[in-house]
Amino acid sequence: MSYWKKIKKKYMGDRAFYRHYLLLAVPMILQNAITNLVSFLDNIMVGQLGTEQMSGVAIVNQLIFVYNLAIFGAVSAASIFGAQYFGNGDHRGHMHSFRFKLYATLLVSGLTMLLLLTKGSDLISLYLTDTVGNGATDVALQYGKQYLVIMLVGLVPFAVNQAYATNIKETGQTLVPMLASFVAVGTNAVLDYLLIFGVGPFPELGVTGAALATVIARYVEAVIVVFWAHRNREKNRYLEGAYRGFGIPVSELKTILIKGLPLMFNEVLWAAGMTTVTQCYSVRGLDVVAGLNIATTITNLFNIVYIQLGACISIVVGQYLGAGELEKAKDADNKMIVFSVFCCVIMAAIMFLVGGFFPDIYNTTAEIKDLATKFIAVSALIMPFCSFSHASYFTLRSGGKTMVTFLFDSVFTWVVVVPVAFLLAHGTGLGIVSVYFLVQATELIKVVIGYCMVRSNVWVVKMV
């Protein structure tokens, strides 16, 4: 067999393989594409109100981001077993993992509400550095507080929705969560326009209207997903007896906690690390906060493909591992990683070429638009490397190597990325764009680590 044929056999699948992969991934990609598109429109509408409003909302969204990742970690702790339970035909085990998700997400929501109600103002202030002396940071703080109080009302429906939606996806049914998301983001977009600007009989509420629109949309999405799941019990066998009791067998709970707690802590610590990096950037002034907000919103539109392709790796590989088909798991993983990176290179190239047009949509200063354009270009250059490390992370997670993923993700962030950001932002005279590039470039170290870990096959484990 020629060298090219060996490479093709190892890293490229046939039509049936990609059809199966894309049937799972495309609904998730579309769901997140619509969500991020509406987030982009929401960001633009808030941006029309002014730099202070946009910055206040952006900072609060950084805090909510940590909560979102905590919820993701809570459901992921059980999902590493859920996919394998389903692949093994163990519906009762799948039900216990669902219960764990409900308990964990509601606990995280309660703790988050308590923290942000008592310390929200202090946390927002950490991101506000007045380098000009015009009082803009005080105005941004007030807008941030207005936005935060209302956003807290949407935490519980988000938590419940994630518990249900992730279990539904583990069964391979990605269409319903996608449709629910479409309805929710449509609701969000319409209400954003009506409530932010006061169209027709609706009051002009500004940032308060943006928060209300988001909260209402979250309730809509949760109701649709929960209603469908209970109306279609035959497709969601894990719901059989889910509410007849509240217990989880000690042995299963212990297993989930041992494997899952590192994953939960990983998501929280990684998200906290990323917000800390943003805080380091923010010491360079409110313009940097605004520019980063624009760039991050645009980047989120383009990184959807590699993020969702990576997430699908844990589902497909997890099902193979649960069924004991270890060689198929390794083969599928190789092909999915290559496909994910290939798709990301295309998206990154498009983002690099057209990303600079987006900042002009915002109602802000030329300086902020210029910063945003440069941040977008840097993000596009680094994105393919992020794709590989992201796929590596989900590969390791599919085999239950949560302690390894903990070291790979959050420990790396706090030991490498955060110190680099802090030292460059506080201790050098480098421009903020140079600082941003050097911090983002630390992803190359992570790529090397991820490659070695995946190649070692430590993740090829049947856990159920």
Language-model segments: residues:
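Small-residue hotspots at the loop-to-helix junctions and early N-terminal turns
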Residues: 51-62, 144, 148, 211, ...
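Short runs within selected transmembrane alpha-helices of multi-pass transporters and secretion channels
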Residues: 75, 79, 150-169, 177-188, ...
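Helix-terminus/linker motif at the lipid-water interface of multi-pass membrane proteins
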Residues: 33, 37-55, 124-138, 194-205, ...
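N-terminal transmembrane alpha-helices
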Residues: 12-44, 48-49, 65-81, 109-113, ...
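Short alpha-helical transmembrane segments in multi-pass integral membrane proteins
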Residues: 1-25, 82-154, 202-260, 317-382, ...
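Generic alpha-helical transmembrane segments of integral inner-membrane proteins
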Residues: 29, 33, 37, 41, ...
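Small-residue-rich hydrophobic transmembrane alpha-helices
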Residues: 54-114, 158-177, 291-355, 386-408
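Transmembrane helical elements of multi-pass membrane transporters/channels
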Residues: 23-42, 150, 184, 217-221, ...
